[in-house]
């Protein structure tokens, strides 16, 4: 059940002047021209930098319904420690998407992906760095020097491709990945499943890829369904349902543990998150009245469940703590900070899947106005206003 303690540290409202008017005066030299500002020099190398990406729309435009999506004059603005860093024009003519899940900050650079219908275009800081002849939804990107690794699902059917600078390393025309491309033990890893037809029966086989080398995951014969699978500290860990076992089970570090579960709840999904010392995970459940809710696990025996209707957003692990947000439901929104709960400011919500980060030990969460006002940055209970007309799409530590 949802905890009763509410920590209301919402004082010290500060205003960050982002200089949007100055940023907006970018000369229209060519479509890939961008504006750069004082945020390019943020940080001195001794502390982490907080990068915020926002979509900034013309004054008076209803960005919540976005009736002219893809054609309205819009900018993807990046802030570094509260200072405007760059502004990239958004729209079909610029091949920069207004979707919040089609950009990310990596090593202080803005990477965007865009689909033309026949090609995928990737840009770095507003400049095209590669394009390849496939229409893909990217679910992961890793950058090593000048090399860009991507994991993408086909927009026109089943299958996926793992690429290096647009060139195919691994391609499958059926199956799916588990939605993450990440480092583990110094290797770039991901997991996927592929259907195998055997004697008129379709069987799911599960695989792991590390630096392009594929190995089949060794699972028990009584596995009915694998909910999630990940490489952690060089070994394969997974959550599965077994024949004859009521509760889902975690297999990790050579051990099998049944999960403590919310009562009268049917699992819909699990997502594992690696911590410094052990794994954490988040689950989504359906109750008998068809309402849904999230739960968080600190270990197989330690489950934090929430009231029906409370669904986790922007969930991540920093150090060995879980951080996430729950957008407003019947009892209002909730911010979860490594075991502590805070009331989300009324009238605000999280608009993207990656709107939270711990920067220099402080939880930063991007909150956007449900009424169309300016967004705010929540910093361990304090609020900072960003004077833009739009919403926060991501918050990243760098």
What annotation goes with each model-predicted range?
Residues 1-7:
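Bacterial N-terminal signal peptides that target proteins for export
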Residues 357, 364-365, 374-398:
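Blade-level signature of beta-propeller repeat domains, shared across WD40, Kelch, NHL, RCC1
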Residues 84-92, 127-132, 167-172, 213-220, ...:
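A short beta-strand motif characteristic of beta-propeller blades
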Residues 95-105, 135-145, 175-185, 223-232, ...:
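Repeated scaffold domains used in trafficking and secretory/extracellular systems
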Residues 9, 15-47:
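Bacterial Sec-dependent N-terminal signal peptides
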Residues 47-57, 112-116, 150-154, 190-194, ...:
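Recurrent small/Gly-Pro-centered beta-turn motifs in extracellular repeat architectures
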Residues 37-39, 43-75, 95-101:
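Beta-strand-rich domains and repeat architectures in extracellular enzymes and scaffolds
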Residues 59-76, 117-121, 156-161, 196-207, ...:
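Structural motif
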């Amino acid at each position: 059940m949802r905890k009763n303690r509410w920590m209301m540290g919402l004082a010290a409202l500060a205003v960050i002047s982002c200089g949007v008017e100055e940023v907006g005066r970018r000369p229209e030299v060519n479509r890939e021209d961008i504006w750069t500002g004082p945020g390019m020099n943020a940080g001195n190398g001794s502390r982490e930098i907080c990068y915020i990406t926002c979509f900034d729309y013309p004054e008076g435009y209803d960005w919540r319904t976005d009736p002219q999506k893809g054609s309205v004059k819009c900018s993807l603005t990046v802030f570094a420690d509260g200072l405007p860093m760059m502004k990239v024009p958004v729209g079909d003519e610029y091949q920069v998407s207004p979707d919040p899940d089609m950009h990310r900050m990596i090593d202080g650079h803005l990477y965007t992906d865009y689909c033309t219908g026949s090609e995928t275009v990737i840009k770095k800081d507003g400049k095209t760095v590669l394009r390849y002849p496939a229409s893909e939804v990217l679910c992961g990107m890793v950058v090593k020097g000048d090399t860009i690794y991507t994991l993408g699902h086909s927009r026109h059917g089943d299958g996926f491709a793992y690429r290096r600078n647009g060139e195919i390393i691994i391609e499958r025309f059926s199956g799916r990945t588990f939605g993450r491309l990440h480092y583990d033990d110094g290797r770039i890893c991901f997991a996927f499943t592929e259907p195998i037809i055997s004697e008129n029966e379709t069987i799911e086989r599960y695989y792991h890829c590390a630096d392009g080398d594929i190995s089949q995951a060794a699972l028990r014969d009584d596995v009915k369904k694998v909910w999630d699978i990940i490489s952690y500290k060089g070994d394969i860990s997974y959550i599965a349902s077994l024949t004859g076992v009521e509760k889902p089970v975690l297999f990790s570090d050579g051990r099998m543990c049944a999960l403590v579960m919310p009562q009268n709840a049917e699992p819909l999904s699990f997502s594992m998150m690696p911590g410094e010392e052990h794994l954490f995970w988040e689950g989504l459940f359906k109750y008998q009245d068809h309402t849904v809710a999230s739960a968080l696990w600190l270990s197989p025996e330690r489950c934090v469940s929430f009231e029906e209707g409370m669904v986790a957003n922007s969930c991540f692990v920093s150090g060995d703590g879980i951080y996430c947000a729950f957008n407003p439901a019947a009892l209002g929104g909730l911010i979860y900070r490594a075991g502590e709960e805070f009331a989300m400011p009324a009238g605000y919500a999280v608009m993207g899947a990656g709107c939270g980060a711990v920067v220099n030990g402080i939880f930063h969460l991007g909150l956007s106005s449900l009424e169309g006002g300016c967004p705010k940055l929540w910093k361990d209970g304090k609020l900072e206003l960003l004077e833009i007309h739009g919403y926060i799409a991501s918050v990243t530590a760098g």
